[in-house]
A protein has these predicted regions:
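Hydrophobic alpha-helical segments
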Residues: 1-176
Length: 176
């Protein structure tokens, strides 16, 4: 059970309604995470702006973007974001076989060299970012642009924050 119920549009103040309208315009849905953060409307706006920026124009393919996000959410064991991003990953083209192999991607032939590097980056950023070797960084730079690498790292950081909020606030998965 959620610690705070999502703030519904009818109960929202004008600042919150404005954020909801922008999220709805850009994404077609206002997720429960956004509705729950509306309990603090001064926190809601910057988080929603970051959420929209990371879900808008991207230097990454949607497939890689969702791979990075889903791996982050799975590592954090966040039911809310895993449920949402499993569906988005499938919509982006990942199969059930890929999703089953995600936890043991290193030994899987389902993922390309580039996809495995993105997954490895998620693990390193999430656990020991200061231990990313120059060799691995060069490898990343050989097939991702600096824009793409920065975006992947930002996705890991942002969704790490969202996962912690969702876990602490016990946000329930969105209804399809």
């Amino acid at each position: 059970m959620p610690r705070y119920l999502p703030v519904q549009n009818e109960a929202a103040n004008e600042r919150v309604k404005s954020v909801y309208a922008e999220v709805m315009r850009q994404l077609g849905v206002v997720p429960n995470a956004i509705k729950t953060l509306a309990h603090s409307d001064r926190i809601l706006k910057p988080v929603a702006d970051a959420y929209l920026a990371l879900n808008g124009e991207s230097g990454l393919s949607e497939k890689i973007r969702q791979l990075v996000v889903l791996k982050t959410c799975r590592l954090d064991k966040c039911a809310y974001t895993v449920a949402r991003h499993t569906e988005l990953a499938k919509s982006a083209g990942w199969t059930d076989d890929h999703l089953k192999a995600l936890d043991d991607y290193v030994g899987s032939d389902l993922f390309s060299f580039y996809e495995k590097d993105a997954l490895r980056l998620v693990e390193l950023v999430r656990s020991t970012p200061d231990e990313i070797t120059n060799e691995f960084w060069t490898q990343l730079d050989n097939h991702y642009t600096s824009d793409q690498v920065v975006e992947m790292i930002t996705l890991v950081g942002f969704y790490g924050m969202i996962n912690r909020l969702a876990l602490a606030l016990q946000i329930e998965p969105d209804k399809p």
